[in-house]
A protein has these predicted regions:
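Non-heme Fe(II)/2-oxoglutarate
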Residues: 1-95
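Extended, compositionally biased low-complexity polar/Lys-Gly-rich tracts
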Residues: 18, 32, 62, 77-85, ...
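Acidic, low-complexity intrinsically disordered regions
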Residues: 47-48, 64, 135, 139, ...
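Catalytic core of non-heme Fe(II) oxygenases with the double-stranded beta-helix
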Residues: 89-210
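Double-stranded beta-helix
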Residues: 193-237
Length: 237
């Protein structure tokens, strides 16, 4: 597999069933996630940007193997994420190898949440990919809930509408955000995420930023974002 594939590709699958969706719904959503992490210049955690999540898998850092467990955000290791990944690997070409998977979780958004624009990998990490899987078995375009992808000026360049079993594979350095549903749909929008990069790179990022408190690169208020890199990515599409 080459990380030059799937810069921003959409695939429609027959993955979702009512039975699978019920398994997703019944997962314990005990933790919250935010796209706007605290920084030295803005140390306060923005509670209004948080939303519910279920962590399925987290990589184990060499420096502190119990790091995620001690923080209370360890993966549940529910077999569900591996079963779905096995299906995706048969349907979608050129996915990264499994041993590059470092995180998997289900995010829950609903009307009134306010997720932020973010990137999944810092601009200098070329070998990365994110997979999003839309899990709701029924979705009406009137309900909103799109994933928005932005260019180097943070102008919207592409919107991907939820659809049962729809999968998006993309370079995580592209700024993006999930939109909540409109007032027409006052229930949960479920999305499963898989995140990849080489194990060596993920370990180094952990050591630099979690253990040694190295400040992250930031531009336009987005951690890891670099306009020139994003401009180049869009030019390659």
């Amino acid at each position: 597999m080459s990380y030059t594939d799937n810069i921003l590709n959409v695939y429609d699958t027959n993955l979702i069933s009512e039975e699978l969706f019920q398994e997703i719904v019944l997962l314990p959503y005990q933790f919250t996630r935010t796209d706007n992490v605290p920084t030295k210049d803005n140390p306060n955690l923005e509670l209004d940007g948080m939303y519910w999540t279920h962590q399925l898998y987290n990589f184990t850092p060499i420096d502190d193997p119990d790091y995620w467990q001690n923080a209370g955000i360890q993966g549940s290791e529910n077999q569900l994420y591996l079963d779905i990944l096995t299906y995706l690997e048969t349907k979608i070409p050129n996915l990264p190898p499994r041993d590059h998977l470092y995180s998997s979780y289900v995010n829950v958004l609903r009307y009134g949440n306010s997720p932020g624009i973010h990137v999944d990998a810092p601009y200098f990490v070329e070998e990365n990919r994110t997979i999003l899987v839309y899990l709701n078995p029924v979705w009406n375009p009137q309900w909103g809930g799109e994933t928005i992808f932005f260019d180097n000026d943070l102008d919207c360049r592409r919107a991907v509408q939820p659809r049962a079993g729809r999968v998006v594979v993309f370079d995580g350095r592209i700024p993006h955000t999930g939109r909540t549903s409109t007032i027409r749909f006052l229930y949960n929008r479920y999305v499963l995420a898989y995140k990849y990069m080489t194990p060596e790179t993920r370990q180094k990022l952990f050591t630099d930023h979690e253990m040694n408190n190295k400040p992250p690169v930031m531009d336009k208020g987005i951690v890891g974002f670099d306009p020139n890199t994003v401009k180049t990515i869009w030019e390659k599409m």
